[in-house]
Amino acid sequence: EGRTTLLGPDIEQATRAREQRLAAPRERLLQAVASGELLIRTRGSAVGQVNGLSVQPIGDQAFVQPARITATARLGEGQLIDIQRETALGGSIHSKGVLILSGYLASRYSARRPLSLAASLVLEQTYGRIEGDSASLAELCALISALSGVELRQGLAVTGSVDQHGAVQAIGAVNEKIEGFFDLCVGQGLSGEQGVVIPAGNASQLMLKEELIAAVESDRFSVHAVSHVDEALALLTGWPAGDPALGANAQTVNGRVMARLREFHELRREQAGARRWPAPGLAGAGETEP
């Protein structure tokens, strides 16, 4: 139009054009969730399960697909199994992110004794290669939920990477991720309990569509910026995160993790003691039962 300056209507028009290009894959996603083909929950709560947000390139556009991240935890010897890596579906940066989680768990919860834990992580219903560490905050929250037994809100999706001290780090495509989950929630019906947890470092980059802003202003959707995993846990659980340095405490998330790991440690000690001696009646020839 001969102008050299972009105005608000120009940006809105470009945004609508992008929305139209992504309409078909978005509609397929909504149908898959509605039919139960893709198991994504945006209501209720669950242990060891949280919604992450993955970005799929479509031409020059980024299409966001929610990814259900699940974790399990059991007695073990410090193993954290990255199922994406074990099946050659995880890239090196994603694998690095999972190794960072292992370091965080060991240093924060088990610095003075062996980590008596075996855990596994996977992005469910993903069949292509996963790269990047932007799911590591969600993965850590799922792991801590599995360990503590505290449920996570399924209406909150989580994006962000973490370092070995639990600090939440900025990620890419933050606007697309928020809007992608918002569109899914609109398709299922906004409940007022849905939203997205993002790194505080991304807050200055937000440029969201008007429909989403209106939903936030009317308390039908929310965007939460966090700087540490403990803040994300408090939002997802409704529990105080607590300080693991204070030991086992059934009233906080981290206190319950400490209690579970102490239980695992005692079980390992008992099993190690039982292996030291043969069971009664099973002494070998020339041996005397204790």
What are these regions (language model features)?
Residues G2-G36, Q194-A200:
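Conserved C-terminal helix/linker of AAA+ ATPases
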Residues L30, A34-T42, A46-N51, A67, ...:
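Peripheral, non-AAA+ core regions of ATP-driven protein-machinery
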Residues A62-P66:
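Short, flexible loop/turn motifs enriched in small residues
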Residues G48-D60:
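Structured beta-strand/loop patches that form or line metal/cofactor-binding pockets in enzymes
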